[in-house]
């Protein structure tokens, strides 16, 4: 089973002991495992192209957020000329080969830890590792790798990735260079993801892990703070495309969203403004305490920034998306 080395273990103890970080040891440890998985995945060769995306990409590649991110997200780009049956077979082969590649790299990936749906267009792998530090409540006990068949809509960037331990200690590392989704596309996808997932709260359903939801809020706010992307009016077209794609993808899981996505997202926007029971605020504070090692806007400020950007996008969209 994958675990960090003795040297890495001692580096973590030194960083925490010297007061160079307030992050729990378990967070730094998992980031090392995440980084090792990224390096291993970079060595995987397949006709399909993998693009690094999501919150971990924002943190480790774009460096626009200063937080621990424990999931690895990728877009898979296949040839557009493939027939549906050939695409399904190619994705199945990629899934199996990638799982074997990770196992050969020392990662514990049981057969039941590999799941796929929608004709293999969505693949999820749960890698198990052995922790040498106390558990952190905000962290899962495994590393989740998620891959979705979808070509990037905008331009990509080639960026290096590092571990938090390497960055904080100044220890030179073997950097992997990844093709990464751009900030604009990630920005829009996270706005839509936050609002869509917030619909659970409007129905009185509490998020099992609210900090999984508020990470989208935090990421959008940090991108907006440092890049002011929300002022780019060209993103309204992208916003509609992402909403429509999500409405198709989640049609069987959320009939209300699929029926009238813009109306549903406006309802979720109001839910953020009201935050009944302060569920989001409490989740945000826990997330900031356990996972963030950089600046942390107060929840009220973060909600205001996110709300303004989301409202501008929603107001630009037709009444029925």
Language model feature labels by segment:
Residues 1-50, 60-66, 76-321:
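Structured mid-to-C-terminal alpha-helical surface segments
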Residues 52-56:
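Glycine-rich beta-strand-to-loop/alpha-helix junction loops that act as flexible
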């Amino acid at each position: 089973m994958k675990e960090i080395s003795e040297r890495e273990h001692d580096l973590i103890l030194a960083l925490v002991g010297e007061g160079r970080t307030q992050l729990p040891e378990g967070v730094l440890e998992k980031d090392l495992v995440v980084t090792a998985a990224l390096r291993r995945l970079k060595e995987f060769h397949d006709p399909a192209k993998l693009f690094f995306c999501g919150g971990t990409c924002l943190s480790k590649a774009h460096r626009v957020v200063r937080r621990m991110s424990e999931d690895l997200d990728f877009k898979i780009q296949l040839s557009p000329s493939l027939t549906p049956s050939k695409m399904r077979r190619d994705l199945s082969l990629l899934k199996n080969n990638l799982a074997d590649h990770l196992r050969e790299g020392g990662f514990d990936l049981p057969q039941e830890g590999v799941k796929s749906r929608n004709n293999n267009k969505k693949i999820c792998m749960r890698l198990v590792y052995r922790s040498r530090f106390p558990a952190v409540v905000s962290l899962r006990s495994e590393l989740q790798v998620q891959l979705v068949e979808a070509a990037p809509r905008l331009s990509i960037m080639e960026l290096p990735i590092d571990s938090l331990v390497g960055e904080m200690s100044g220890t030179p590392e073997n950097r992997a260079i990844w093709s990464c989704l751009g900030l604009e596309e990630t920005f829009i996808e996270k706005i839509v993801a936050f609002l869509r997932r917030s619909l659970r709260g409007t129905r009185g359903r509490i998020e099992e892990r609210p900090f999984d939801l508020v990470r989208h809020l935090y990421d959008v706010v940090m991108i907006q703070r440092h890049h002011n992307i929300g002022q780019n009016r060209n993103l309204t077209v992208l916003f509609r495309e992402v909403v429509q794609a999500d409405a198709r993808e989640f049609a069987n899981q959320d009939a209300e969203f699929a029926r009238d996505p813009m109306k549903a997202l406006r309802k979720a926007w109001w839910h953020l403004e009201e935050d009944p029971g302060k569920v989001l605020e409490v989740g945000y504070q826990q997330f900031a305490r356990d996972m963030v090692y950089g600046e942390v806007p107060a929840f009220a400020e973060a909600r205001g920034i996110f709300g303004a950007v989301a409202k501008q996008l929603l107001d630009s969209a037709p009444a029925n998306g």
